[in-house]
C-alpha cells in the first residue's frame, strides 16, 4: 500500500505568521494535535514545518513567554520529515520510527501537500490486516477439523 492510499487528505494547516493563540484555537476547533505549516508556491500549499500542541507547551508555556510575542514560525519544527505519495507504507512507518515522529505530511512528487499520516493510521491498518489473517487461520483450522470428522 502506498502513502497516498492511507493518508488523511483533510490536513489542518497554518501559516508561519499565525499567532500562537489562533493556532491553539484552530487545533482545539479541529480536534487535532498538530498543524502542518505551509508556504504557498504557485497557489499550491508546500509543507515547511509542523507545530504540535507539545511545541506550544514546551517552547512557550513552560518558559513563561507571552503568547503575543511569538508566532507559529518562531516555534515550529523546521526539520520536517515528509514522505511522497508513492512511498510504501511500511517504509513510511520505518522512517517515522527512526525519526521518532507520530505524524508525517504526504507530498506529491512536486512537493505539494496532499495529506498526512499519523502513527495511529498505520496501527489501525496493521490491526485490521492481522485480524483478517487471524480469521483465515481459524477458518482453515475449522475446515481441516471438518475434513477429519
Q: Can you name each region flagged by the protein language model?
A:
Residues 19-20, 58, 115:
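Generic signature of intrinsically disordered, low-complexity, basic-rich segments
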Residues 10-13, 46-47, 82, 112:
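Short, flexible active-site loop motifs that bind/organize anionic cofactors or intermediates
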Residues 1-9, 50-84, 88-97, 118-149:
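Tandem CBS (Bateman) regulatory domains
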